[in-house]
């Protein structure tokens, strides 16, 4: 299956890479990176579908942080005024979460400390809004378990940005996996990849980047997308999705090493 999807990607990209088409779009158009996003959807859709209809796959506006902005203290006692900061990701596998917040009396004053808050069933029109019912706020947002950044090529500045995004994601969701996928690489050999926070970098064509005009020369050889690289990506994501994340100190002691690999 991975080979069939790879072949479809290669055919589609060869069509778009023709000079009379490619010159109509610059790097800001995101045309070529969006092709990779679509490729990832078809690569993983059956795998993710096996987890059920609630599984999230595709481009997503995901949870980044939460903060509280009541206009004054007396209002904070009525409801929390929570705000969810979000971040765009090219491709994610994850879950959509609905949470409710409400202001409550301190535990020692609460006559029913074990009472559960009833979730509001009405969903906001979009993920940037909050549903307020009485003093209860309901928020909906996506949590990525796998986040994949799609690039035509990757240089050092881009890698630094990817590393910061990976660090932010893992601070909120330590069980997440952050991957960067590109066609070409534009990094020199003196770059130390171990200092960056991304979990893996995939170069689909296993080829250094060249300026676009050189790719139109007759003697330029463009490597095909390597199916072995695609398989490695697929198996890495599959392993992460099917691994038990509940390990801890006790299981680590039994192994003898605390951080599982």
Which stretches of residues belong to each language-model region?
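Short His-Asn-centered micro-motif
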Residues: 148-153, 180-184
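Short, flexible loop/turn elements at secondary-structure junctions
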Residues: 95-97, 151-154
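Active-site-proximal segments of catalytic enzyme domains
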Residues: 95, 114-142
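Conserved catalytic cores of phosphodiester-cleaving nucleases, focusing on short active-site segments
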Residues: 91, 144-152, 162
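Short, small-residue-biased leader/transition segments that mark boundaries at the very start
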Residues: 1-5
């Amino acid at each position: 299956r991975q080979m069939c999807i790879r072949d479809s990607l290669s055919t589609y990209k060869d069509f778009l890479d023709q000079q009379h088409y490619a010159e109509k779009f610059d790097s800001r158009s995101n045309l070529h990176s969006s092709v990779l996003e679509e490729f990832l959807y078809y690569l993983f859709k059956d795998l993710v579908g096996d987890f059920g209809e609630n599984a999230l796959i595709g481009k997503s506006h995901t949870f980044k942080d939460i903060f509280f902005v009541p206009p004054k203290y007396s209002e904070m006692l009525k409801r929390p005024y929570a705000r969810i900061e979000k971040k765009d990701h090219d491709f994610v596998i994850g879950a959509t979460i609905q949470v409710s917040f409400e202001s409550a009396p301190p535990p020692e004053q609460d006559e029913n400390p074990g009472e559960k808050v009833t979730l509001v069933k009405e969903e906001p029109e979009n993920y940037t809004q909050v549903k307020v019912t009485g003093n209860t706020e309901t928020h909906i947002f996506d949590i990525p378990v796998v986040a994949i950044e799609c690039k035509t090529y990757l240089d050092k500045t881009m890698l630094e940005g990817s590393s910061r995004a990976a660090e932010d994601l893992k601070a909120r969701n330590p069980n997440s996996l952050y991957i960067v996928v590109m066609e070409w690489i534009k990094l020199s050999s003196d770059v130390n990849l171990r200092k960056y926070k991304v979990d893996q970098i995939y170069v689909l064509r296993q080829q250094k980047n060249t300026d676009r005009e050189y790719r139109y020369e007759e003697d330029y050889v463009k490597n095909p997308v390597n199916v072995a690289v695609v398989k490695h990506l697929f198996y890495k994501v599959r392993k992460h999705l099917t691994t038990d994340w509940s390990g801890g100190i006790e299981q680590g002691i039994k192994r003898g090493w605390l951080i599982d690999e």
